Amino acid sequence: MGATGDAEQPRGPSGAERGGLELGDAGAAGQLVLTNPWNIMIKHRQVQRRGRRSQMTTSFTDPAISMDLLRAVLQPSINEEIQTVFNKYMKFFQKAALNVRDNVGEEVDAEQLIQEACRSCLEQAKLLFSDGEKVIPRLTHELPGIKRGRQAEEECAHRGSPLPKKRKGRPPGHILSSDRAAAGMVWKPKSCEPIRREGPKWDPARLNESTTFVLGSRANKALGMGGTRGRIYIKHPHLFKYAADPQDKHWLAEQHHMRATGGKMAYLLIEEDIRDLAASDDYRGCLDLKLEELKSFVLPSWMVEKMRKYMETLRTENEHRAVEAPPQT
């Protein structure tokens, strides 16, 4: 009995002395159940502390997670600075895209060309942070002729023999046509098949505030070409079409004439021209005609004025080409 009392002394005050009852007092003989609430709380706090320590260790010892967390915090600021850089050079991309559209044809989507050029810039910028031992990837859409030229330049640079400088200016016609064919573009010489932009349909005076217009996408569906986007522009390049700028698209979206398209192109056509096409021999009796798709609308004076200037520019350009063309013998 005395030994048992000595063994129980280190347990400290009993539950009754602390104002509580220990479950060990009610247990079976010879079994000590430590149910001191203070001990339970101490153990629980230790478990929680150990759990937090392990989680913190996992997060901060993984370099990929740590760097990605930092990148996610800095990404909005980085995006703003990248957008500022692109805005600085956007005027060059816009001029180049418009020049391509003038040379190739009106069916070229200038906005899409700009977006692709910006994405290519970002892809090439990745090479700034690539390993020196890795091979620099080539663009998939580079033309074969350009690839051969660059490879020859690199080989001559290794040999130390300089290449003769190329003369600036437009390449010969046969080279230009072969390059375009390699890129997958259907090229038609303008000298053989000129686009006629003359006559009463190209008279800017016909455009006024009462003139009704339709979206190019709806005109495409109305003439039975809804399955192929932009087919109407390829089949009828003589039609006057106006590419809406961001200000025009904002007004059209506010008036519920079109949905917000973001960076996509939106063309406006004259409703009278579309109905004249539908009544022509090419479409008369066509079962795919859906003229009910033409949801016409009128435009404000400031937009009509821009369309007049645009039509006058195209018409005047064709007149100059007709004057400069040599007489046929």
UniProtKB/Swiss-Prot annotation:
Keywords: DNA-binding, Nucleus, Phosphoprotein, Transcription, Transcription regulation. GO terms for molecular function: DNA binding; nucleosome binding; protein homodimerization activity. It holds the Pfam family DNTTIP1_dimer. Its main location: nucleus. Signal peptide: none annotated. Residues 147-158 have a biased composition (Basic and acidic residues). It is found in: Nucleus. Residues 1-22, 147-178 are annotated as: Disordered. The modification Phosphoserine is found at S161. One of its GO terms (cellular component) is histone deacetylase complex. A motif (Nuclear localization signal) lies at residues 164-170. Residues 159-173, 216-237 bind DNA. InterPro entries: DNTTIP1_dimer, TdIF1, TdIF1_C. Residues 56-147 are annotated as: Important for dimerization. Residues 197-316 are annotated as: Important for DNA and nucleosome binding. Monomer and homodimer. A minor proportion may form homotrimers. Interacts with ZNF541. Interacts with the terminal deoxynucleotidyltransferase DNTT. Interacts with TRERF1. Identified in a histone deacetylase complex that contains DNTTIP1, HDAC1 and MIDEAS; this complex assembles into a tetramer that contains four copies of each protein chain. Component of a histone deacetylase complex containing DNTTIP1, ZNF541, HDAC1 and HDAC2. Identified in a complex with KCTD19, HDAC1, HDAC2 and ZNF541. The N-terminal domain mediates dimerization. Increases DNTT terminal deoxynucleotidyltransferase activity (in vitro). Also acts as a transcriptional regulator, binding to the consensus sequence 5'-GNTGCATG-3' following an AT-tract. Associates with RAB20 promoter and positively regulates its transcription. Binds DNA and nucleosomes; may recruit HDAC1 complexes to nucleosomes or naked DNA. This is Deoxynucleotidyltransferase terminal-interacting protein 1. It comes from Homo sapiens. The gene is DNTTIP1.
